[in-house]
Curated annotation (Swiss-Prot):
Region entry Disordered, spans: 201-222, 238-315
Protein name listed in UniProt: FGFR1 oncogene partner 2 homolog
Gene Ontology biological process terms in this record: negative regulation of hippo signaling; positive regulation of Ras protein signal transduction
Disulfide-bond pairs as recorded: none
Alphabetical keyword list: Coiled coil
Signal peptide bounds: none
Family label: Belongs to the SIKE family.
GO cellular component: FAR/SIN/STRIPAK complex
Pfam family of the protein (one): SIKE
Extent of Polar residues compositional bias: 246-269
Coiled coil regions, renumbered to chain: 32-99, 156-183
Length: 315
C-alpha cells in the first residue's frame, strides 16, 4: 500500500506540475492580450483627442474659408502635377540623349578596337623574314671569309710546292755534281779517307733532302694554319688589319728567303796533275793524302738543307 501511495503521489505531482505550466502559459497569454488592449485604449483615446481638436478648429472657421483653402490646395496640387509631368518629359529626353551618346560611344570604341587589333600572322611572317635576312647576311660574311682564307691557302700551297720543286731540282743537281766528282776524281788516284767521308755525306744528303721536304711540308702546314688564324682574327677584330697584313706578308715571304739561303755551293775536287807522282806516306805503304784534293766539309748541301728546315718552323 505504501508503494502504491508513493506512486500515486508522484503521478499527482507530475499532473500538478503540468497544470502549473499550462496555467503559467495561459497567464503569459493573458498578460500579452491585456497589453494589446491597453495600447488599443491609448490609441482610441488619442484619436478622441484629435477629433475634439479638429472639431474645435472647424467650429472657429466658416465654410468659405474652408472652400478657399481647399481651392488653393487644389491649385498647388495641379501645379505640382504639371511640374511632375515636365520633369518626366525632361527625364525621358535625357535618357534618350544618354542612350544615343552611349550607342555612338560603343560604335566608336568597337571600331577603334577592330582597327587596333594585331595581325599575328603578319607579325610572325615579318619576324621570320627578319631572321632569314640576318642569316643570309651571316652566310655571306662567312662565305667571304672562307673565300679569302681559301685564296690565301692556295697562294701558300703554290709557294710551298714551288719551293719544294726548286729544292728537289737543286738536290738532283748536287747529286749529279757529286757523281761526276766521284767518277772523275777516283780514276787518277786511289780511294782515300776523304772519299769515304764524301760518300757518307752524299748518303746523308739524300736522306736529309727527303727529311727537309717533309719538314718543309710541315712548315707549310704550320704557315697555312697561322695564315688562317690571322685571317679569322682580322675579320673578328677590325681594329688590327694592318698588323695581320704585315704578319701574312712575312709568312708569304719566308719561303722565298729560305729558298735563297738553301743554294749550296758546288763541290770541287782537285786532282793531281799527271806529271806529279804521289808522295809516299810515313809507313811507305801507299801514296800520301793530298791535302789540296780533299773537298771542303763545311760546304756540303745537307747542312744548308738542315738549316732551312730549322729556319722554316721558327718563322
Amino acid at each position: 500500500m505504501s508503494n502504491l501511495s508513493v506512486g500515486q503521489i508522484i503521478m499527482d505531482a507530475q499532473r500538478m506540475a503540468s497544470r502549473v505550466k499550462d496555467l503559467d502559459a495561459l497567464g503569459t497569454a493573458l498578460l500579452e492580450e491585456a497589453e494589446n488592449n491597453n495600447r488599443l485604449v491609448e490609441s482610441l483615446r488619442q484619436y478622441q483627442d484629435d477629433i475634439e481638436s479638429l472639431n474645435r478648429i472647424s467650429n472657429n472657421k466658416t465654410n468659405a474659408d474652408m472652400v478657399n483653402r481647399i481651392q488653393q490646395q487644389n491649385i498647388n496640387s495641379s501645379e505640382i502635377l504639371k511640374e511632375n509631368r515636365e520633369l518626366k518629359i525632361f527625364i525621358e529626353d535625357y535618357e534618350r540623349a544618354m542612350e544615343l551618346m552611349m550607342q555612338k560611344y560603343r560604335e566608336h570604341t568597337v571600331s577603334k578596337v577592330l582597327d587596333s587589333k594585331f595581325s599575328f600572322k603578319e607579325l610572325y611572317n615579318e619576324r621570320m623574314w627578319q631572321v632569314i635576312r640576318e642569316q643570309r647576311e651571316k652566310i655571306n660574311e662567312m662565305a667571304a671569309v672562307m673565300q679569302l682564307a681559301a685564296s690565301v691557302d692556295d697562294g701558300v700551297v703554290q709557294r710551298e710546292l714551288q719551293t719544294i720543286s726548286q729544292l728537289r731540282l737543286e738536290n738532283e743537281t748536287l747529286r749529279e755534281l757529286l757523281q761526276i766528282s766521284k767518277q772523275y776524281g777516283s780514276s787518277q788516284r786511289p780511294i782515300r779517307e776523304s772519299d769515304h767521308l764524301l760518300e757518307e755525306k752524299a748518303v746523308q744528303t739524300d736522306s736529309t733532302a727527303d727529311d727537309s721536304a717533309d719538314d718543309l711540308s710541315i712548315s707549310g702546314a704550320s704557315v697555312e694554319n697561322m695564315n688562317n688564324n690571322s685571317v679569322i682574327q682580322m675579320y673578328s677584330s677590325p681594329e688590327q688589319p694592318a698588323k695581320v697584313a704585315g704578319t701574312t706578308n712575312s709568312f708569304n715571304t719566308a719561303p722565298v728567303h729560305s729558298q735563297s739561303e738553301t743554294q749550296a755551293p758546288s763541290v770541287t775536287l782537285e786532282t793531281a796533275p799527271p806529271g806529279e807522282e804521289p808522295l809516299a806516306n810515313d809507313n811507305n805503304n801507299g801514296p800520301a793524302v793530298n791535302t789540296t784534293s780533299a773537298p771542303p766539309p763545311a760546304t756540303t748541301s745537307n747542312e744548308s738543307v738542315e738549316d732551312q728546315a730549322t729556319v722554316a718552323p721558327a718563322t
